[in-house]
Amino acid sequence: MPGKRDLCMRFFCGLAAVVMVVAAAAGEPSAPDQVVAEAGWKYRVVTRNLPGIDNLVMALDGSLYATQELPNGAGKVIRLRRGGVTVVATGFSRPDGLLLRGKFLYITEEVPEGRVLEFDLQSKKQRVLATLHNPEGIDTLPDGDLVVSEDSINGRLLRVRRNGAKAVEVILGGLNRPEGLVAKPDGAVIFAETATGRVLSYKSGEVNVVVDDLDEPDQVEIAPDGSLWITEDTRDGRLLRLKDGALETVLSGLRSPQGMAFGSDGSVWLAERGRQRLLVIHGEDSR
């Protein structure tokens, strides 16, 4: 029969295990912060308690818009400014992709019959531009139309017109879970093909591999200096930068990092959904 000391040790070990399981189920870290900034980089936590935080866009006034990808009409778009959080729009089902153009926000709902929405920041009115299968990534093509990805096994890149025409045009099909994307001024579309671990480029009927051997690449963004930033949506995810043909890790140990945005001061803003928080990253050498 075990002694009192052994029984106490077993009790406290079991209690610790229960606490860890409950914390994991709640989406909170069960261990101290394990995010590692590589040499030359530093980060800090700006805002906490942002469940489902996903994609980000930076406004000209320095405020940040973000989607909170919550299901069944609980999803919302919020505005973060000087530490404050304001709800901009609600009633969405898993709002994911986010784009800001002038007074309009464009939002995608990542559900089987997900809407691509245009939301007027001034009038607060919205209209449905298209209904697609798991729409996620969104950006503007050089001619003003939208390009949207469908996050599915037989996924597509689609052209969605902003003029109210309901018809959509297939740009590229047969993809394996395309997610985040960015359109370049020359018409090329850079996108993450999550299931294959690749970032691809599509232009004029030609597909090229930009980066491969990644672990569930999720979002991609092009910084003002032309470098390509990538997040890996895993429990031990990374924030990556591709510059001048060299891929480097900026942060590791992230929990499901999602969207990025760039500040006018060279900062990088990052949604870390797994820890329900917003980070800001700076290069220590001001690069």
Model-derived segments and their meaning:
Residues 2-15:
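Bacterial N-terminal signal peptides that target proteins for export
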Residues 24-29:
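Boundary at the C-terminal end of the N-terminal hydrophobic targeting segment
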Residues 31-50:
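A short helix->beta-strand "capping" segment at the edge of beta-propeller domains
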Residues 42-47, 84-89, 124-130, 166-172, ...:
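A short beta-strand motif characteristic of beta-propeller blades
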Residues 49-61, 74-75, 91-109, 113-115, ...:
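Beta-rich, blade/repeat-based domains predominating
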Residues 68-78:
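Beta-propeller domains
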